[in-house]
Design a protein with these regions (language model features):
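Intrinsic-disorder/low-complexity, polar/charged segments enriched in Ser/Thr/Lys/Arg/Asp/Glu/Gln
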Residues: 2-8, 45-47, 60-62, 76, ...
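Hydrophobic ligand-binding cavity/cleft-lining segments
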Residues: 1-45, 49
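A contiguous pocket-lining binding segment that forms or flanks enzyme active sites
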Residues: 135
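A generic structural micro-feature
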Residues: 1, 40, 55-61, 88-92, ...
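Generic structural detector for well-ordered beta-strands
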Residues: 8-10, 39, 53, 66, ...
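Glycine-rich portal/gate segments that line the openings of hydrophobic small-molecule binding cavities
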Residues: 39-83
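Beta-strand/loop substructures that line and gate deep hydrophobic ligand-binding cavities in soluble
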Residues: 69, 78, 82-130
């Protein structure tokens, strides 16, 4: 199942400060509700996991988060998320693009979900991901 989301956010922090914060995956990943960094694996990558609740189901996805593109002059960054459901056969993979402007920016997410999570239906999956990324976008302003 493919899910595409776009979330604008605003902040009063200087654009250089926000850009530096989004490049720090050990600060950025925990901004997603239920997510934590397990291990730093390189200058631009971490192993992470997230606990997600969809309806009556709780799932844990673990995998990698890696910055795959950086454009400091345009204040743009793209990260790749690849994860597998623990104890299941599902996957949750995403490309997350950050575009910053003075006063805020946009988070664009293109996700692919399979397994139990996808079986919950497009409406439920979209709603859960939308809420997670909306909350995450709000936390970007505080980094």
């Amino acid at each position: 199942m493919a899910v595409r989301l776009e979330h604008p956010f605003s902040t009063e922090k200087p654009i250089d400060e926000v850009y530096a914060a989004i490049l720090d995956l050990e600060r950025l990943v925990p901004c997603v509700q239920g997510a934590s960094v397990l291990e730093k694996t390189g200058p631009d990558s971490v192993k992470a996991q997230i606990d997600i609740k969809m309806g009556a189901m709780s799932m844990i996805f673990a995998g990698t988060v890696e910055i795959v593109e950086q454009d400091p002059e345009a204040y743009r960054m793209v990260m790749s998320v690849k994860s597998k459901e623990q104890g299941g056969s599902g996957y949750a993979n995403a490309e997350v693009a950050f575009s910053l402007t003075d006063g805020g920016g946009t988070v664009n997410t293109n996700a692919q979900i399979t397994g139990k999570a996808a079986s919950m239906g497009e409406g439920v999956v979209h709603g859960v991901l939308d809420a997670l990324i909306n909350d995450f976008s709000g936390k970007l302003a505080t980094l």
